[in-house]
């Protein structure tokens, strides 16, 4: 028996319903006796076309009436989009990390390397990127999928003619199965996810968030330090404009007995909303201007660049902030032997090149871990667990 619609291609073999498009209006919960929907805080604010819900709801009712279970337990990924770090809980994080470890073991030309064959990912980048764009494209291709890419959508797409983000998303979703979006405006990914009928992955939205970077950062810490509970992390550099440190802070707050140090020039201090969030979650945090002392206490020194592009015409403030906190041999000498230095990259002069040779310099390994995290995300969003 086979059921189909404009949204789904449903096969009753093995009692599994395989969505052609994996984005659903509500999270799916499967059990042995019934299938039900649950709303999440993130999804409650999202509006979906009634026709999509009607189709899905009727499929659900049909399958329940026939006594057939459409999803094997745990097959459907809990999230429809990856927009912000607050979407993840510890169970989801642990499960994603398990999938990422599996991704590390995939061999070329193996059956596992073709699990996304027939799927097409669009990378829509309105801001420059090297690692994020290339790692997502590499992740897709390493799993057998294909890629549509635009490197500078702000200049070389219809956005230059005045097309809205919403119209662009509605158009591009007709060509692809998933969109990886980087945009210069905070909240752009949420806007895209609200109107898209396919998964949206936030690859950075202005000074807002960068959730896939935070996932790979936490994965890196686990791989390098061996634990996440009880760690001390020093966040250094541009904490006001750095979307990576915002997303990372949200994820670190999910672990026990974590302490976070904020080390930054006055003009780019961590914003109050993040500090208030940590306080509300009972996370210990401290602001400091002594990088040597913080480095001596921390398991992770997470350095970031001062983001010149966020200063506009106030280049005097940029020059005032730049170069104030540098990771060099003096910082290495203060650090513990097990500790690591991380950086989301690109690096300017905030980590001296001679640090690269020290085994505690983890930033290039961090970039490699990002490939496996993004392979895991693509696999989960498109085909499930």
Curated annotation (Swiss-Prot):
Reaction catalyzed: carbamoyl phosphate + L-aspartate = N-carbamoyl-L-aspartate + phosphate + H(+)
Cell compartment(s), UniProt: Plastid, Chloroplast
Binding site for UMP: 131-132, 182, 210, 243, 305
Ligand binding (L-aspartate): 161, 243, 305
UniProt keyword Lyase, yes or no: no
InterPro entries tied to this protein: Asp/Orn_carbamoyltranf_P-bd, Asp/Orn_carbamoylTrfase, Asp/Orn_carbamoylTrfase_sf, Asp_carbamoyltransf, Asp_carbamoyltransf_Asp/Orn-bd
Subunit and interaction comment: Homotrimer.
PANTHER family: ASPARTATE CARBAMOYLTRANSFERASE (PTHR45753:SF6), ORNITHINE CARBAMOYLTRANSFERASE, MITOCHONDRIAL (PTHR45753)
Free-text function comment from the UniProt entry: Catalyzes the condensation of carbamoyl phosphate and aspartate to form carbamoyl aspartate and inorganic phosphate, the committed step in the de novo pyrimidine nucleotide biosynthesis pathway.
Protein name (Swiss-Prot/TrEMBL): Aspartate carbamoyltransferase 2, chloroplastic
Native source organism of the sequence: Pisum sativum (Garden pea)
């Amino acid at each position: 028996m086979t059921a189909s619609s404009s949204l789904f291609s449903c096969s009753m073999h093995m009692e599994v319903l395989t969505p052609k498009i994996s984005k659903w209006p509500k999270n799916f919960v499967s059990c042995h006796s019934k299938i039900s929907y649950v709303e999440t805080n993130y999804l409650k604010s999202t509006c979906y076309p009634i026709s999509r819900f009607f189709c899905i709801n009727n499929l659900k009712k049909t399958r329940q009436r026939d006594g057939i279970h459409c999803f094997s337990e745990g097959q459907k990924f809990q999230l429809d989009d990856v927009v912000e770090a607050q979407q993840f809980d510890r169970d989801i994080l642990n499960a994603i990390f398990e999938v990422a470890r599996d991704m590390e073991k995939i061999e070329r030309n193996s059956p596992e390397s073709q699990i996304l064959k027939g799927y097409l990912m669009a990378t829509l980048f309105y801001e420059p990127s090297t690692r994020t764009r290339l790692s997502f494209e590499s992740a897709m291709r390493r799993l057998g999928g294909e890629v549509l890419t635009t490197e500078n959508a702000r200049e070389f797409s219809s956005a230059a003619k005045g097309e809205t983000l919403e119209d662009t998303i509605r158009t591009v979703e007709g060509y692809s199965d998933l969109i990886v979006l980087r945009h210069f405006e905070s909240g752009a990914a949420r806007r895209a996810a609200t109107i898209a009928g396919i998964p949206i992955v936030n690859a950075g939205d202005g000074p807002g968030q960068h959730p896939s970077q935070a996932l790979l950062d936490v994965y890196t810490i686990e791989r390098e330090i061996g634990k996440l509970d009880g760690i001390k992390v020093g966040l250094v550099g541009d904490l006001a404009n750095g979307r990576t440190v915002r997303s990372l802070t949200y994820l670190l707050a999910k672990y026990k007995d974590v302490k976070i140090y904020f080390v930054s020039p006055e003009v780019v201090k961590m914003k109050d909303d993040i500090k208030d969030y940590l306080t509300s979650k009972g996370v210990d945090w401290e602001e400091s201007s002594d990088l040597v002392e913080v480095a001596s206490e921390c398991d992770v020194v997470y350095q970031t660049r001062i983001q010149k592009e966020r200063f506009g015409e106030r280049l005097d403030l940029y020059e005032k902030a730049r170069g104030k906190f540098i990771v060099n041999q003096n910082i290495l000498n203060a650090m513990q032997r097990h500790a690591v230095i991380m950086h989301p990259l690109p690096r300017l002069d905030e980590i001296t090149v001679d640090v690269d040779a020290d085994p505690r310099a983890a930033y290039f390994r961090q970039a490699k871990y990002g490939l496996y995290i993004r392979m895991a995300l693509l696999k989960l969003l498109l085909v499930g667990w």
